[in-house]
Regions:
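Exported/periplasmic cell-wall-interacting domains
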Residues: 2-13, 43, 47-53, 57-121
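A structural motif detector for short, solvent-exposed N-terminal "entry" segments of globular domains
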Residues: 2-43
Length: 121
């Protein structure tokens, strides 16, 4: 059985930037762009909050509404998670969370430790 929340690489510094207009999530590793992922963000009536946050919790079995994994942010009731509606990726359709394809959130779940900074712009 794998650990819940391993540090991906001791000493490696990660940062996440979510671009709500471009519908993209970028991961920076030690200050350099490492990976980019397409996302869905909040719809106009429930926009994704902008600002500086951190990953405060992780859930490996969040239930069908949140896809394969959940990365909870320091913003109340907001997270980065998977989806069982892959057709929603690339659109502004969520209740404020950031959605990714399930294989992408699986990768981020194991890559990003709790405490990782997340900027949403």
């Amino acid at each position: 059985m794998r650990e819940c929340c391993p540090d991906s690489d001791a000493g490696t510094k990660f940062k996440v930037v979510v671009h709500t207009r471009e519908l993209r999530l970028d991961v920076f590793r030690d200050g350099k762009l490492y990976k980019s992922y397409p996302v869905a963000v909040g719809k106009p009536e429930t926009p994704t909050p902008k600002g500086e946050f951190t990953i405060v919790n992780k859930d490996g079995t969040p239930g069908p509404r949140f896809g394969a994994r959940w990365l909870g942010l320091s913003a109340p009731h907001i997270g980065i998670h998977g989806t069982n509606h892959p057709q929603s990726i690339g659109r502004a359709v969520s209740e404020g969370c950031v959605r990714l394809y399930n294989p992408d959130i699986e990768e981020l779940y194991w890559m990003l430790p709790i405490g990782t900074p997340v900027t949403i712009i």
